[in-house]
């Protein structure tokens, strides 16, 4: 039997500070509308989503401040690196996300930008609430204690 050519999910950019700075309530996978040169640049892996966030305009959700650098081999048809990019979601998903943002003071932050099995660019979007300084310290203490516990158990045998 011939094996099926299966592609793995390729993570291109990850917002590693998001889990430290925000308490994440829910995540949603969203498509992202990119131009041709943006797709090629994202595949090169130079994308940054650390300072970006999602916001609504005219009932749609847009990714703001994500840095996708210009594609070097492109000529005059290149894209603007920090332009707002439309996120592709169903209407029910948009209403749910905007409701959480309006009612509960949540914010929408990207966690990962990746290509799925079909080669489509996807964004893992989180509904999150910002942590205060003492919350960050508390989560850091919990993480350190978990590491220390693991070390003690391994040393004990």
Swiss-Prot record:
It is found in: Cytoplasm. GO terms for biological process: trans-translation. One of its GO terms (cellular component) is cytosol. Residues 135-151 have a biased composition (Basic and acidic residues). SUPFAM superfamilies: Small protein B (SmpB). GO terms for molecular function: RNA binding. Residues 134-157 are annotated as: Disordered. PROSITE patterns: SSRP. The keyword Transmembrane helix does not apply. Pfam families: SmpB (PF01668). Keywords: Cytoplasm, RNA-binding. Belongs to the SmpB family. Required for rescue of stalled ribosomes mediated by trans-translation. Binds to transfer-messenger RNA (tmRNA), required for stable association of tmRNA with ribosomes. tmRNA and SmpB together mimic tRNA shape, replacing the anticodon stem-loop with SmpB. tmRNA is encoded by the ssrA gene; the 2 termini fold to resemble tRNA(Ala) and it encodes a 'tag peptide', a short internal open reading frame. During trans-translation Ala-aminoacylated tmRNA acts like a tRNA, entering the A-site of stalled ribosomes, displacing the stalled mRNA. This is SsrA-binding protein. It comes from Nitrobacter hamburgensis (strain DSM 10229 / NCIMB 13809 / X14). The lineage of its organism: Bacteria, Pseudomonadati, Pseudomonadota, Alphaproteobacteria, Hyphomicrobiales.
């Amino acid at each position: 039997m011939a094996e099926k050519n299966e592609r793995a999910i390729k993570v291109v950019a990850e917002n590693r500070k998001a889990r430290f700075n925000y308490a994440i309530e829910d995540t949603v996978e969203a498509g992202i509308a990119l131009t041709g040169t943006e797709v090629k640049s994202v595949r090169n892996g130079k994308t940054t989503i650390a300072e970006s966030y999602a916001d609504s305009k005219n009932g749609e959700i847009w990714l703001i401040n994500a840095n996708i650098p210009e594609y070097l081999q492109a000529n005059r048809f290149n894209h603007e690196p920090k332009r707002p990019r439309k996120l592709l979601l169903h209407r029910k998903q948009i209403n749910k996300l905007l409701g959480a943002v309006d009612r509960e003071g949540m914010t929408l932050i990207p966690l990962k930008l990746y290509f799925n099995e079909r080669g489509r660019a996807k964004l893992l979007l989180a509904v999150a609430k910002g942590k205060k300084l003492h919350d960050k310290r508390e989560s850091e203490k919990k993480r350190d204690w978990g590491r220390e516990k693991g070390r003690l158990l391994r040393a004990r045998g």
